[in-house]
From Swiss-Prot:
It catalyses: guanosine(46) in tRNA + S-adenosyl-L-methionine = N(7)-methylguanosine(46) in tRNA + S-adenosyl-L-homocysteine. This is tRNA (guanine-N(7)-)-methyltransferase. GO terms for molecular function: tRNA (guanine(46)-N7)-methyltransferase activity. It comes from Mycobacterium avium (strain 104). The active site is at D166. The keyword Amino-acid biosynthesis does not apply. It comes from the Bacteria. S-adenosyl-L-methionine binds at E91, E116, N143, D166. Gene3D superfamilies: Vaccinia Virus protein VP39. Its EC number is 2.1.1.33. Residues 1-74 are annotated as: Disordered. Substrate binds at K170, D202, T238, K239, Y240, E241. Signal peptide: none annotated. Belongs to the class I-like SAM-binding methyltransferase superfamily. TrmB family.
Length: 259
């Protein structure tokens, strides 16, 4: 399988159930416009809600469906948002942010934008950012395809991370998987030359699908294990993977570079 991408099998698995990045058909996509956010406020603790109200205006951005998806607005000014010029990594489906936080701390010179649809996961990450005084993470609540299409400029990202996207295991749902040729092509378009696409999955069938999709994208090539990379790919093992290790689940990782 090595010709499809750099793949590492290791024991472990899974992310919380509330962190899918698999996307339904366009007509079925779950958007969270600003008017809908209040309906889930009760899911946050008082401390989380207070931190959200205090820090979200500075560190967060909510993205709803475009009125005209064929006419995207201006892309994010990441230099202004972070207050500096630095390499930018987009993490799609950050869940509760365990990996996001650890990897951002590991590389303080890299700016990380974490995308997630679920407010509770973002609130957990926001509280950790506030507690640990982490300055190189920003958060987006919304649909990952909307973010890629409307907010990210071509050839602007040093890395994209997609860890444990929803595998949609039933055959009739495979079309809902996030990592399809069109999406991977869009990611490739947003990566700088030499930029990294780092994917991890614990689902064997999805791993085969991802390998095929990556091999079919001409702008990506497998990373050479001996070549230096512009960002770290040392992904921390979460408690969810540790718990599943006893079950014999294996994680497959892919690392591609933009040509």
């Amino acid at each position: 399988m090595g010709h499809h991408g750099q793949m590492h099998a290791q024991h472990g698995v899974t992310m919380p159930a509330d962190s899918p990045t698999g996307q339904p058909d366009r007509s079925e996509q779950r958007y969270f416009p600003a008017t809908a956010f209040r309906t889930r406020r009760s899911t946050l603790s008082d401390a989380q809600r207070q931190t959200w109200d205090r820090r979200w205006p500075e560190l967060g951005l909510s993205v709803g469906p475009a009125e005209d998806p064929d006419r995207p607005g201006p892309p994010l000014d990441t230099d202004a948002w972070f207050g500096r010029k630095a390499p930018v990594v987009l993490e799609i489906g950050c869940g509760n942010g365990t990996s996001t936080l650890a990897m951002a701390k590991q590389e303080p010179g890299v700016d990380v934008i974490a995308v997630e649809v679920y407010r509770r996961g973002l609130a957990q990450l926001l509280c950790a950012i506030d507690r640990d005084n982490v300055t190189n993470i920003r958060l987006i609540r919304g649909n990952a395809l909307d973010v890629l299409q409307r907010l990210i400029a071509p050839a602007s990202l040093t890395g994209v991370r997609v860890f444990f996207p929803d595998p949609w295991p039933k055959a009739r749902h495979h079309k809902r998987r996030f990592l399809q040729p069109g999406t991977v092509g869009l990611i490739a378009d947003r990566l700088l030359p030499g930029g990294v696409l780092h994917v991890a999955t614990d689902h064997a069938g999805y791993a085969e699908h991802i390998a095929d999709v990556g091999a079919g994208e001409p702008r990506l090539r497998p990373a050479d294990p001996d070549s230096p990379l512009p960002i770290s790919v040392a992904r921390p093992t979460t408690k969810y993977e540790t718990k599943a290790q006893d079950a014999g689940s294996a994680v497959t990782e892919f690392i591609w570079l933009r040509r």
